[in-house]
Amino acid sequence: MIAYIVRRLLYAIPILIGVNLLTFTLFFVVNTPDDMARMQLGIKRVTPEAVQKWKAERGYDKPLVHNEAADGAGKVTRTIFFEKSLKLFALDFGRADDGRDIGHEIKTRMGPSLAIALPVFLLGLFVTVTFALLLAFFRATYLDFWGVVACVALMSISSLFYIIGGQYLVSKVWHLVPISGYAGGLDATRFLILPVVISVAAGIGSSTRWYRTIFLEEIGKDYVRTARAKGLSELTVLFRHVLKNAMIPILTGVVVVIPLLFMGSLLVESFFGIPGLGSYTIDAINAQDFAVVRSMVFIGSVLYIVGLLLTDLSYTLVDPRVRLQ
């Protein structure tokens, strides 16, 4: 297993380099360092001297990927790509274009992101699995039919509708919770209730429908018919046998998401004014802050690779027949 983990981590290096190169290319196809300087300076008629000063202070006065004027390794190392992207492998995030330390911002904003992502993940998993088991238990009945119809309807509604509608009804009309904002400690609870409920509601349809399909596939297998033939009740068969064997495909979609919880939610954090990593990324994109964008893309890629690795390792815990080679 150790050899497998090491091999997967080595495979991740070229993938991360490719992701960094793709992010770098896409960003600078749309923008140039001069465009970034003019946007950050916020002046319509900015002087060329001010642009050059801004670029020099932030390291954007170098060539993008190849420095002809440098000697030896400097042709590669004294470039924007090397200094802004490859240093991420040493966890050197550098500074944002506004001068703030990106590493400090990530540490500060990780707490609010987890404060909303963890409840959404745990509550959403419990609710969707419970509903899916309920529909599987009452399969081929009116409850199952209308449950599937409700799932499809919920899937068809945009997340923006849930957010805007929830803010209008719960906060503006009923005045139950604040419409947006965030506070530290236990005071954060009143700001998190609405975004957590909305996030769970937005994901119920697709997740419940997927889990229901998995449970129905397991119910049709031979071991379930054998369990029924032994006289076990339908509830016992469903919870003791079907749920256990359905954990392998469920883990595929669940474990891989766990590391990504640190990244927060882009839409929810932005609409509800939560100072997490999701809103931090959106603000950086709007400000064309490449330093922050490439850092967040890199962290997201690393967490996704870690999630895939954890998924493979979790298979061996759920199913002893699985061997990693």
What are these regions (language model features)?
Residues 2-3, 110-143, 159, 183-325:
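Alpha-helical transmembrane segments of integral membrane proteins
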Residues 6-16:
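N-terminal signal-anchor/signal peptide hydrophobic helix marking the start
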Residues 9, 50, 54, 77-93, ...:
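Hydrophobic alpha-helical segments of integral membrane proteins
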Residues 12, 109, 113, 149-152, ...:
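Residue-level signal for discrete positions within transmembrane alpha-helices
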Residues 16-21, 152-163, 253-258:
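Hydrophobic alpha-helical membrane-insertion segments
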Residues 16-76, 174-188:
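Hydrophobic alpha-helical transmembrane segments of membrane transport/permease proteins
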Residues 25-34, 87, 149-178, 198-200, ...:
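Membrane-water interface segments at the C-terminal ends of transmembrane alpha-helices
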Residues 63-129:
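An internal, D/E-rich "acidic patch" concept
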